[in-house]
From Swiss-Prot:
Organism of provenance: Phaeosphaeria nodorum (strain SN15 / ATCC MYA-4574 / FGSC 10173)
Region spans: Disordered: 504-525, 549-730, 789-856, 869-928, 1086-1105
UniProt function note: Microtubule binding protein that promotes the stabilization of dynamic microtubules. Required for mitotic spindle formation.
Listed Polar residues bias regions: 605-624, 653-672, 684-710, 895-905, 919-928
Protein name in UniProt: Protein STU1
């Protein structure tokens, strides 16, 4: 065909001529391509056409010309195949493949796709050359060529079933390629190729992934997709469950009348499977038998020997892995290898099941249960070993272990083949309720085997013994077993029933598992009424009625008539020992809370009680009537006016005089001021009303308060009787409340409780002040509420001669002491703050009051008007805390009685020098003991000095540390003048803590105990004496960091060291601690590859691992200090910022991974502290500080900072 030849020659000439227009070339190419598509290509035109195509594909000036060349080549190959003249293709294959290899890595996607298609077309014609080209492309350096070649392999495998085994090794190698695109393509190509591959190929793939050290994320992705595909296929191919096999009906008429569904309901409930696991476990699929054998071989070492801290976790993980394998395909596809592997690990599995770790033991028991349910008869050879183990476990004292053993035994019996040894093990077990369920399981699952093997007599003996057992729980369990036995062998059950006693028969008939229970109950109801009177239930009811009647008669006989004018008539029943006194006294005070203009004649009278009841809020109150004990023994009756809670003297033989004097004049009275109606609710209405919620005062939370103790207040509060005229010699005895004066307050503080009527006088009990005085003593107290502007002064109260004093009581000493008169904040309610100590005003003694002055009777100081001048009224909570153990509290000051101003040294008064210690909240405790020179204090000081010497000489024992800890927590003044021993003890403990273990000449266990005690002593001083230890915080922090080098991170003392460092960071001086830690870590020798071996360091004695632990903890501490500096608004100086940045850059090159990890966290904290806002990167102080870091380290920092920002 001359036309095609002419066109081909013209095209070849145009392609070879550079000056030919591109459009002309394309036109000529289109003509040739059209002739190829529609006409036969003569042999003389084939070689020139190949040359034209080669020139066009290799052209670089026109992409359109290249695409036309690929299109023409595709049509040309198809035409030659139709003409069956492919020899020219094989002859030109070498040139063509070289050209296509170049185009596989072309920048244009269209060119790569065209070359990929051409290779697919050429593969049937010259497969060797094409596969060689693909191998070269996958091994080459061009990333695009690698992507295209792997895509070609996947395409050819899916369309042409191309074997890919020859390419798998290179694809796995490409999983670790430097180019991320190549890794991603290789990952998806491996998944696509191996999804339909056989299981042994997948197993080999996993081994190659491990051997080539493929990164974990890619390997996990591939494994998960392959396992997911296998799981999905298994679920799709799973056959439907077989229909349930119905058991044959019972042969006899008696068995046909029984109802098993209703008669053994409790047994069915007991056999429900254990609850589903909280943690879902995915099955593990095994692809080859060799892989399964390798897994069992790797599991063996942790199961050997005894359980220890080093192998228990591996045992638990292996047990969980076995359960996952059991859920997979291994038991079905490789049963022989699986059973053999389980047998080799059986001893270790039983060790796991018998461990004392509850979760681990449960895991082992569940594994055995699942083995029994899955392998069933395959575990018959191990049945005796398993039963011996788990029957023994059923006797464990731990309930969870016993239940696990019971469930496991039932699972084993239910699923294995029966033999006589199983029945013997069950019969040999101790008689208990669990054995009853095992017998039921044997009857249900193996009834035919038991009957034919001669085990029926043994079963009968077990059930008869259980039904007649002495334990009621065992009898109850075996009744259900009996009726299960009766379902299968009714004749034997009836024969056994006839041999039982009447009690056992009755219990069996009434058992809920009895199918004929309704018939038995109807028969029993038809019995004569005689059984109702003589039966056990009727006898118990009659006995109960008789006891109740006797109780009512006793209560009626023991009733005591009400005592008029009784002091106990208004007392509520005692609720507890701690509130006994308070409840009685509040009831007495409540009777005086009347709204009338004047008080009633007597505070203890019944009329006053009734008036208080009328003012009570709501019905149902505790004061809704006269309250007395329901049963009062006659021998405890007291006189009508006795106060059961009054204070009595020991030894004087006198009784408390009447609250209402017998000689009180009826007409002559002293004029007194009338108290107006109170604007607040009376105490009786809030103390005894159940409808009032106890609302705490806000002053306890938000304001600085001075807490007043009102112990025993209003316990014997009585209304003042009308006093006689001035000329009448009247002997008046009044039971007086225990009242403290209110100390003077600074303008910035308010009293905790402004009592009603504190501007009036009060009467004091002479017994409280002077224990040896007569009973006719009356004390007049002047105005208690003083103006805040009054100056502070101290005048000791006038007291009597010591000859009048008996043994001092705490309350008497409180009133005599100027300290207790002015500062009573250590008692009763406590606040976290305290106003400066002041002295109480003068108190004139009324011992020698002139007879013509008359008796002054004043209003109840607790029920009067509230002072109008008080702006912040603080009410005491109705059901708040009660001041108990006053005597003990008086000797021991409170831990929270000093304000925060005292901690900072801003106290308004110069306190005497005394022992002081700080609590964990920073408040200071002062103990102003007058016995600083007593023997105990001197002894403790000598012991402290001896302890310090022993610590310095490294001969101290642990009991000495504990003794010093007790002295530190005590209130004794053990530190001496200017607290010189305090610093000596702290520094000695710090030096002892830093000493290496090798330098202490004792055993390592004892050294560890000594270090722990030394650290406990240091922590006690830090927490209790925070003000004194403030200057040592940086020193202690450095010691803690250096000591950390001696201990592993998992040791207990390491945890205590970290806790101590956290407390110092939280409460210490941030700037000082920051500088100290910086100096410490800067002195550490660098562990970078470029570090000099002669680097300067003060810690050169530290080993490599110890130095790493110190550096890691120091970096974490620096990060915490930087964070807390931001919280405290502490500015980092430029010098500190520069040093921190240099440290960060230095630690980036550290050889230890833990140090680098801690350094990253430290850099993140530093960035959050000093980084500039977004958009001001040029002013960012963080990047300037770390400017010396290498580029890869800066990139790593940027990654973690972006990750933190995204989180």
């Amino acid at each position: 065909m001359p036309d095609m030849l002419e066109q081909t020659n013209a095209l070849l000439a145009a392609l070879k001529k550079p000056s030919t227009n591109v459009d002309q070339r394309l036109q000529l190419f289109s003509n040739v391509k059209s002739n190829i598509k529609h006409n036969r290509v003569p042999e003389e035109c084939q070689a020139p056409i190949f040359e034209c195509i080669r020139i066009a594909i290799s052209a670089t000036t026109s992409a359109t010309l290249v695409s036309t060349g690929f299109s023409t080549l595709s049509h040309f190959i198809k035409r030659l195949q139709l003409q069956r003249e492919t020899a020219v293709i094989t002859s030109q294959s070498s040139k063509l493949c070289a050209l296509l290899l170049e185009k596989l890595g072309d920048a244009r996607e269209s060119h790569r796709s065209a070359s990929l298609q051409i290779l697919a077309d050429l593969h049937p014609l010259c497969p060797l050359e094409v596969e060689t080209l693909i191998h070269n492309a996958m091994k080459g350096t061009n990333a695009r060529a690698k992507d295209t070649s792997m895509t070609w392999v996947v395409k050819m495998n899916q369309t042409e079933n191309l074997p890919f085994r020859a390419y798998s090794a290179q694809m796995i190698a490409n999983l670790e390629d430097a180019d991320a695109g190549v890794r991603d393509t290789a990952k998806h190509a491996v998944v696509d190729l191996f999804t339909s591959a056989p299981e042994h190929a997948k197993a080999n793939l996993k081994k190659q992934l491990v051997s080539t050290n493929v990164r974990k994320a890619i390997a996990t992705y591939i494994t998960a997709h392959l396992d997911g595909a296998a799981t999905g296929g298994a679920h799709e191919e799973m056959p439907p469950p077989p229909p349930a096999v119905r058991e044959r009906p019972l042969p006899t008429q008696r068995a046909q009348t029984l109802q098993p569904d209703h008669g053994i309901a409790d047994a069915l409930a007991a056999e429900q499977p254990p609850p589903t696991e909280a943690v879902t476990m995915d099955p593990i699929h095994i692809y080859t038998q060799r892989e399964l054998e390798d897994i069992f071989r790797d599991m063996a070492p942790p199961f050997e020997g005894r359980e220890s801290e080093g192998n228990w976790l591996a045992r638990d993980k292996n047990t969980t892995k076995l359960r996952r394998i059991l859920m997979g395909n291994a038991p079905a596809e490789f049963p022989g290898a699986f059973v053999a592997g389980i047998k080799s690990l059986l001893e270790g599995i039983l060790k796991v099941a018998n461990t004392l770790r509850t979760t681990m033991s449960t895991n082992g028991c569940q594994l055995v249960q699942e083995l029994a349910k899955t392998l069933r008869h395959a575990i018959d050879p191990w049945v005796e070993i398993l039963l011996q183990c788990f029957i023994k476990m059923c006797a464990a004292t731990k309930n969870i272990a016993a239940q696990n053993g019971n469930v496991t035994v039932e699972a084993i019996i239910s699923n294995v083949s029966y033999n006589n040894r199983i029945l013997q093990h069950v019969s040999f077990a101790a008689t208990n309720a669990l054995r009853a369920s095992w017998v039921k399981t044997l009857i249900r699952k193996h009834k035919a085997h038991v009957e034919h093997s001669g085990g029926l007599d043994t079963l009968e003996k077990i059930i008869r013994k259980g039904v007649t057992d002495a334990n009621p729980k065992v009898r109850e369990a075996y009744r259900s077993t009996y009726w299960t036995f009766a379902l299968v062998w009714p004749q034997r059950a009836e024969a056994m029933f006839e041999t039982l006693e009447k009690r056992e028969k009755t219990a069996l008939e009434k058992d809920p598992n009895n199918p004929n229970a309704s018939l038995a109950s109807s028969q029993s109801s038809a019995v004569s009424s005689f059984s109702k009177s003589v039966g056990a239930g009727a006898a118990r009811n009659a006995l109960k009625e008789k006891i109740a009647e006797q109780r009512r008669a006793k209560m009626a006989a023991s009733k005591v008539p009400e005592r008029p004018m009784s002091a106990a008539a208004t007392y509520s029943p005692v609720k507890s020992a701690s509130t006994k006194s308070l409840s009685a006294r509040t009831a007495s005070t409540a009777s005086t809370a009347s709204n009338g203009p004047a008080r009633p004649p007597s505070a203890m009278s019944g009329e006053s009680t009734k008036s208080a009841l009328k003012n009570s809020s709501g019905t149902g109150s505790l004061m809704s009537g006269t309250v007395r004990r329901p049963i009062r023994r006659p021998e405890l009756n007291r006189p009508a006016t006795a106060d059961p809670y009054a204070v009595r003297r020991a030894g004087n033989g006198k009784t408390t005089p009447s609250m209402t004097p017998e000689k009180t004049p009826a007409v002559t009275t002293t004029k007194k001021s009338v108290a107006p109606k109170s604007s607040v609710r009376p105490r009786a209405q809030t103390q005894n009303s159940p409808n009032v919620s106890p609302i705490r005062s806000r002053s306890r939370l938000g304001q600085s308060t001075t807490v007043q103790k009102t112990a025993s207040a209003s316990s014997r509060q009585a209304s003042p009787a009308p006093s006689a005229s001035k000329d009448e010699d009247l002997e008046l005895t009044i039971v007086k409340p225990f009242v403290r004066s209110q100390s003077h307050h600074d303008p910035g503080t308010i009293p905790f409780r402004q009592r009603n009527g504190l501007d009036k006088s009060a009467v004091f009990d002479n017994e409280t002040v002077l224990s040896g005085d007569e009973d006719n003593f009356t004390m007049v107290i002047p105005n208690l509420a003083r103006p805040t502007a009054q100056s502070i002064h101290h005048t000791p109260p006038k007291t009597h001669s010591p000859s009048h004093l008996s043994a001092p009581s705490p309350r008497a000493s409180m009133l005599r002491s100027p300290k207790s008169m002015g500062d009573i904040n250590g008692f009763g309610f406590r606040s976290s703050t305290r106003s400066p100590r002041v002295r109480s005003p003068d108190r004139p003694s009324t011992r020698g009051t002139d007879a013509q002055e008359g008796v002054q009777v004043f209003e109840d100081p607790f029920v009067g008007d509230e002072p109008a001048a008080v702006e912040h009224e603080v009410e005491k909570p109705v059901l708040g805390e009660l001041p108990i153990n006053e005597k003990n509290i008086e000797r021991r000051p409170s831990n929270e009685s000093i304000s925060s101003d005292t901690v900072m040294g801003n106290a308004s008064e110069d306190r005497p020098r005394g022992h002081h210690k700080t609590t964990s909240t920073g408040s200071v405790l002062y103990s102003e003991s007058n016995d600083t020179n007593n023997a105990e204090v001197l002894k403790n000081r000598q012991l402290l000095a001896s302890g310090i010497k022993k610590i310095e000489s490294r001969t101290v024992e642990s009991h000495m540390f504990r003794r010093m800890q007790d002295m530190i927590r005590s209130n004794h003044e053990i530190w001496g003048a200017n607290d010189e021993n305090f610093g000596c003890l702290l520094l000695a403990c710090l030096d002892f803590l830093e000493v290496p273990t090798e330098e202490l000449k004792t055993t390592p266990i004892k050294v560890a105990n000594l270090k722990v005690q030394a650290l406990a002593t240091i922590r006690a001083m830090l927490s209790l004496y925070r003000k004194e230890t403030a200057k040592y915080f940086s020193r202690v922090l450095c010691t803690v960091l250096q000591t950390k080098a001696q201990y592993e991170n998992t040791s207990h003392i390491a945890i205590d060291l970290e806790t101590t460092a956290e407390e110092i960071v939280r409460y210490g001086q941030t700037s000082d601690c920051l500088n100290a830690v910086l100096a410490l870590i800067e002195d550490l020798p660098s562990s970078t590859p470029t570090s000099s071996p002669s680097s300067k360091s003060s810690l050169t004695s530290l080993p490599g691992a110890g130095q790493t632990r110190t550096a890691t903890m120091a970096l974490s501490t620096l990060a915490a200090l930087i964070q807390i500096s931001g919280a405290k608004n502490i500015t980092l100086s430029p010098d500190q910022t520069s040093r921190l940045g240099k440290l960060a850059v230095r630690c980036m090159d550290d050889q230890d991974a833990d140090v680098r990890k801690s350094n990253i966290e430290f850099c993140i904290a530093l960035h959050e502290r000093i980084a500039a806002p977004a958009g001001e990167q040029e002013n960012d102080g963080f990047w300037r500080a770390v400017a010396g870091a290498r580029e890869q380290h800066l990139n790593l920092l940027t990654y973690y900072l972006a990750k933190r920002r995204a989180a």
